[in-house]
Amino acid sequence: MTSKTLILICNQFPFGRGETFISNEFNYLHSAFDKVVILSRTDETVQTRQIPNDVELFKISPKSNLLQKIKFLFILVSNRQRVKRLLKHEESSVYSIFKKPATDSQKRKMKHDLFKALEIKNYIEKKIIPKTGTNVIVYSYWQNSSALSGILLKEDKLCNQAISRAHRGDLYFDVQ
């Protein structure tokens, strides 16, 4: 029997002061999986919350340095059809919701989020999947580029399932 692994992608947990609700559900997650991996998108260095010793913790900076931007160009070139398809889908989603084309600002945000999603997906594919195998559920605490990275991993059959928590701002456009 293969072991079940959870990859939890969050912005700070177990660092910093945010994402306090993860603390409340973490014991349930930990007991439901054979292995738990946390990928925290933070530059924080001080761990403020305790996690069990058997949980693997990875960090990826939310900021992109020059080397990451250069790497992204290679990722972008090798995924250009996928990028084109995803951006077209995003633009059509904006049109279906707002009944007008995406603004330049929205298009820049879409490209940035896709860049970050590909960066996170690439990190998980290269650094975490070799240690865990693909019997994995990716759980993004936020519906942002982290959630999109889970979808990309699922499309590439590198995980069994990709899920994301929905917060009020994800559901209601008047709350941002």
Please name every model-derived segment:
Residues 1-70, 131-134, 160:
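N-terminal subdomain of nucleotide-sugar transferases
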Residues 12-16, 144-147, 156, 160-176:
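A short, histidine- and acid-enriched strand-loop-helix "catalytic/donor-clamping" loop
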Residues 21-25, 149-153, 176:
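A short acidic, amphipathic alpha-helical/loop segment
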Residues 25-28, 125, 133, 161, ...:
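Membrane-proximal helix-turn-helix segments that form the acceptor-binding/catalytic region
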Residues 32, 153-156:
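Active-site catalytic microenvironments for nucleophilic, acid-base chemistry
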Residues 45-115:
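A conserved catalytic-core segment of Leloir-type glycosyltransferases
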Residues 45-46, 146-150:
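Short, well-ordered alpha-helical microsegments
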Residues 96-98, 108-117, 121-145, 163:
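Short N-terminal targeting/anchoring amphipathic segment
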